[in-house]
Amino acid sequence: MKILTGTINELLNEVKAENNTNNSLQVESEVKSIIEKVKKDGDQALFDFTSQFDGVRLTELRVQTADIQSASSKVDPAFLVALQQAKANIESFHSKQKQHAFLDSEKDGVIRGQLIRPLETVGIYVPGGTAAYPSSVLMNVLPAKIAGVKRIVMITPPAENGINPHVLAAAQLAGVDEIYQVGGAHGIAALAHGTESIPKVDKIVGPGNIYVATAKREVFGLVDIDMIAGPSEIVVLADENANPAFIASDLLSQAEHDILARAILITTSKKIAEETQNEINKQLENLPRKAIAQKSIETQGKIIIAANTQEMFDIMNEIAPEHLEVQLENPMNYLNQIKNAGSIFLGSYASEPLGDYFAGPNHVLPTSGTAKFFSPLGVEDFTKRSAFISYTKEALAKEKDAIVLLAKKEGLDAHAKAIQIRFEEEN
């Protein structure tokens, strides 16, 4: 893991050099072909692609209700308790995000307002196959339920022995309405276009590999999506009082995700930089996913020694990380200096996995610098706003001349006429 020093511009160039997503033309071409086949052949294309990509020959796509209900009996009861605790925290946090309708009548004869309506049908993508991500089920489904989405459709790739019971148990607990054992770009295509079995949805959310991300980009506009997620990333800000073992473990918690994951420490202390580097090498030896984490640390990892605290925040805000840990003395004092970050962890005991699984804020976060303009997944992502207005004749009469003037200045005479015609009988 490189230790970097230099001017702020030199340091930014170092970290920006890796800040790109793999958007190969070959993947895009393959995904377009997959989408077209699903549009043309429907369910049969899903059976074919599931056999080709997952090595599983399906006879039906929908997971039966009995299989979902029996999943809880196949998992450790302690897991179910932990899942219920996480669910309570996620619901508690996200329920505070609910937007509200409003109505005002500040002028005589004028009523204006806003309606908040949930989306009708949402598709949730949950990575699957050999891996299991029940936390992803909760983080994507629960905000949609709180928003009032009527139909939640989940898709996840199958393994040879079906779908992981931990994922099914999480789906039942969260309140998923339908589950289909299909994944990849073909699963995204099915949600966007609909097939004989899978309904077309209004929005698709959830993480996935580059094929899933590319497919989401391709269908955006036909349906809404949450975001295009890149590899996971973390930036830790640390002063001379931080614990190098804590820092190293948190950096590795992201590095083990993916060889392209980015783990960056920014510190004002050379001693902390060197001790953290040693801790990373030490802790790597005991990781089951050592090969992935080590490759990530070697190719994407950085330790930056900043000149001062302000420079730490300047560099971090330019990176706009998915996860930001502030391991500084009195971390709450620095909240105002944070402009661009997906999720923020304050203090030595707010470790990033706390947010991944349990604390309540969402773990579906903007990556690759998009925290400059995107937000974490939330309840508002599953709602839409409509405005309404009502004017009496007397209220419109007071403002008609201004409206007509504006319309004519834009050369839209029919707009002007639509106002004028309502008062012609008086002339």
Swiss-Prot record:
<feature type="binding site">
    <location>
        <position position="356"/>
    </location>
    <ligand>
        <name>Zn(2+)</name>
    </ligand>
</feature>
<keyword id="KW-0560">Oxidoreductase</keyword>
<feature type="binding site">
    <location>
        <position position="415"/>
    </location>
    <ligand>
        <name>Zn(2+)</name>
    </ligand>
</feature>
<dbReference type="GO" id="GO:0008270">
    <property type="term" value="F:zinc ion binding"/>
</dbReference>
<feature type="binding site">
    <location>
        <position position="232"/>
    </location>
    <ligand>
        <name>substrate</name>
    </ligand>
</feature>
<dbReference type="InterPro" id="IPR001692">
    <property type="entry name" value="Histidinol_DH_CS"/>
</dbReference>
<feature type="binding site">
    <location>
        <position position="356"/>
    </location>
    <ligand>
        <name>substrate</name>
    </ligand>
</feature>
<comment type="similarity">
    <text>Belongs to the histidinol dehydrogenase family.</text>
</comment>
<dbReference type="InterPro" id="IPR016161">
    <property type="entry name" value="Ald_DH/histidinol_DH"/>
</dbReference>
<keyword id="KW-0520">NAD</keyword>
<dbReference type="Pfam" id="PF00815">
    <property type="entry name" value="Histidinol_dh"/>
</dbReference>
<feature type="binding site">
    <location>
        <position position="415"/>
    </location>
    <ligand>
        <name>substrate</name>
    </ligand>
</feature>
<feature type="active site" description="Proton acceptor">
    <location>
        <position position="323"/>
    </location>
</feature>
<feature type="binding site">
    <location>
        <position position="257"/>
    </location>
    <ligand>
        <name>substrate</name>
    </ligand>
</feature>
<feature type="binding site">
    <location>
        <position position="323"/>
    </location>
    <ligand>
        <name>substrate</name>
    </ligand>
</feature>
<comment type="function">
    <text>Catalyzes the sequential NAD-dependent oxidations of L-histidinol to L-histidinaldehyde and then to L-histidine.</text>
</comment>
<dbReference type="GO" id="GO:0000105">
    <property type="term" value="P:L-histidine biosynthetic process"/>
</dbReference>
<feature type="binding site">
    <location>
        <position position="254"/>
    </location>
    <ligand>
        <name>substrate</name>
    </ligand>
</feature>
<keyword id="KW-0028">Amino-acid biosynthesis</keyword>
<dbReference type="GO" id="GO:0051287">
    <property type="term" value="F:NAD binding"/>
</dbReference>
<feature type="binding site">
    <location>
        <position position="257"/>
    </location>
    <ligand>
        <name>Zn(2+)</name>
    </ligand>
</feature>
<keyword id="KW-0479">Metal-binding</keyword>
<dbReference type="GO" id="GO:0005829">
    <property type="term" value="C:cytosol"/>
</dbReference>
<protein>
    <recommendedName>
        <fullName>Histidinol dehydrogenase</fullName>
        <ecNumber>1.1.1.23</ecNumber>
    </recommendedName>
</protein>
<feature type="binding site">
    <location>
        <position position="410"/>
    </location>
    <ligand>
        <name>substrate</name>
    </ligand>
</feature>
<dbReference type="InterPro" id="IPR012131">
    <property type="entry name" value="Hstdl_DH"/>
</dbReference>
<dbReference type="GO" id="GO:0005737">
    <property type="term" value="C:cytoplasm"/>
</dbReference>
<feature type="active site" description="Proton acceptor">
    <location>
        <position position="322"/>
    </location>
</feature>
<dbReference type="InterPro" id="IPR022695">
    <property type="entry name" value="Histidinol_DH_monofunct"/>
</dbReference>
<keyword id="KW-0368">Histidine biosynthesis</keyword>
<comment type="pathway">
    <text>Amino-acid biosynthesis; L-histidine biosynthesis; L-histidine from 5-phospho-alpha-D-ribose 1-diphosphate: step 9/9.</text>
</comment>
<feature type="binding site">
    <location>
        <position position="254"/>
    </location>
    <ligand>
        <name>Zn(2+)</name>
    </ligand>
</feature>
<keyword id="KW-0862">Zinc</keyword>
<dbReference type="GO" id="GO:0004399">
    <property type="term" value="F:histidinol dehydrogenase activity"/>
</dbReference>
